A protein has these predicted regions:
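Extracellular jelly-roll beta-sandwich "head" domains, especially the C-terminal globular C1q domain
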Residues: 1-144
Length: 144
């Protein structure tokens, strides 16, 4: 089971806000991964088979980030968040030398969801300023 969510157009993402995903080229037919078009939150369900006590998902994000016009060139970052909190180990940082210079970043994490529970994930701008995000691609794969 795999899901792919995308947003190709450039979007302005304020500091502390989530990247929005507008399209779902690959959808989950079992209801394990739930997403509303245009939203930034993705819900992972802890539906388990047999004796398993957790459902494990591999979450991967790839996209282009840049400092928008009016911003200050310097380090900008995104990270995968779980339950509204950024996971520090998933921080993807780029340091554009000029406003508008786009950098490709990627990050991934395993997310365990206990049987009967759900987890909300997102890709969050953890920079201190707004960023532009283009060609955003979030892939979620159930691996166990």
């Amino acid at each position: 089971m795999a899901v792919e969510l995308t947003a190709n157009a450039v979007q302005a993402v304020a500091a502390g806000q989530n990247v929005l995903f507008t399209d779902a080229p690959v959808k989950c037919s079992r209801g394990y991964v739930v997403h509303r078009a245009g939203a930034g939150l993705v819900t992972l369900r802890g539906a388990c088979n047999g004796c398993a006590s957790v459902a494990r998902y591999k979450v991967m994000f790839v996209g282009n980030i840049s400092v928008p016009t009016g911003g200050t060139a310097g380090a900008i970052s995104v990270a995968i968040s779980i339950g509204g909190e950024a996971v520090p180990q998933t921080t993807a940082t780029a340091t554009p030398a000029a406003v508008g210079d786009a950098w490709n970043v990627a990050t991934a994490a395993f997310v365990d969801v206990h049987r009967g529970y759900c987890a909300n994930i997102a890709v969050r701008n953890i920079s201190t300023q707004a960023i532009d995000v283009a060609n955003a691609n979030l892939m979620v794969e159930r691996v166990a």
